[in-house]
Structures are given as C-alpha cells and as structure tokens.
Amino acid sequence: MDILEYIEQHSTPESEALRQIVHTTHIEMINPRMMSGHIPGRVLSMFSQMIRPQRILELGTFTAYSTLCLAEGLADDGTLVTLEHNDELEDMILRNLALSPLGEKVQLVIGDAMEWLSAQSSDWLYDLVFIDADKREYSAYLDAVLPLVRPGGWILADNTLWDGHIIEEAYDKDKQTLALRAFNDKVAQDERLDKVILPLRDGLTIIRKKI
C-alpha cells in the first residue's frame, strides 16, 4: 500500500455517479488525468460544503467530475455555472450530470470562457470560482472573475504547481509553465487577496477576495 491508497481508504468514498464518471472518462477520453479524481474531488466538495455557496462558477468542465463535487456544497437553492470550450464534450457532460440529482443545479455553457466572462455583469456575484481551464489564460481569467466574486468570496485555481515544472529550469520556455508562473506571481503580489498554495496533486491555490 502506498500513501495515496492509504489516504483514499481513510477518506469519504466517491458517490456512485462519480464512480461512473471515472469509468467512462477512462474509457472514452485520451487524457483522463485531466479529471480531478477522488482526493482532489473530496477537497473541492469539502471546501464547497464549508462555505455553502449560493453561486459557483467553474471554468473548465471536462467530464463534469469536479462539477458534481463542487455542487455537493451548494445551498439548497444554489446554482453552479460551468464553462467548457470543447463542444465535442457537451453530450458526455450532459450524460454525466444526469447521473446525479445535483446535475439539475448545473448550467452548462459551451464556448470561449473569456468571451463569456467579458459579457457578464458585476450585479451577479459568485461565492466560489474554480479555475481549471486553459493554463495560458489563468492570469486573464483572474482579472475577469475578480469583479464577479463577492467580497469575502473564494477562488480555487488548479494545477498551479504543474507537476513540479513550475520551479524547473528545463521548462523555462514552456508556454503553459511560464503562464502559470506569471499567474502565481500575480496572485502573490495582489494585496487584495489572501492566498495559499496547497501541494495537492498538481497544486491547488486557495484565494480569498478581501474586498
């Protein structure tokens, strides 16, 4: 038994819906590792349950595993809006959302995240935002979502350690690595934000908007 197996055995198990999503994702997708997975999913669920958000925004749906994890903490009349750029995933996402009653609280938007964000009004504020889309756009996503997050609201950003590449010189010319470094620096230097990076899988940054 390795440490990950130990952690999984001592954590809340996945729901049947999530197990089905894991199964179909591994069968149908070329890169199933893009899915959050059991322990990161439990962290998303636990975080959402702690704050009981009325409104959640997710950038990057993939196969909706993380979507349903986040939805576990929604207020009874809460809503989760999830954005996915790849229209080829739409049917699979809708099938997966239908596996759980929580899927009824989810609004799927297919299209470019930046275009959608730029059209939103700050009259509709989110309690929690999860960023897990194009790594090269993380800094732009942050600028776009900050006005849409309520004061005291939360932003979670996935993959911010990028499998450790973030500090490796061998990746100094890799565009995704450079973009994530810039994002991490941007967050660290922004005094409007409280922040911490957790060494969970590829790195998870927790951000609280102060004002």
Regions found by a protein language model. Name each.
Residues M1-L128, K135-L156, T160-I211:
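A short alpha-helical cap/connector motif
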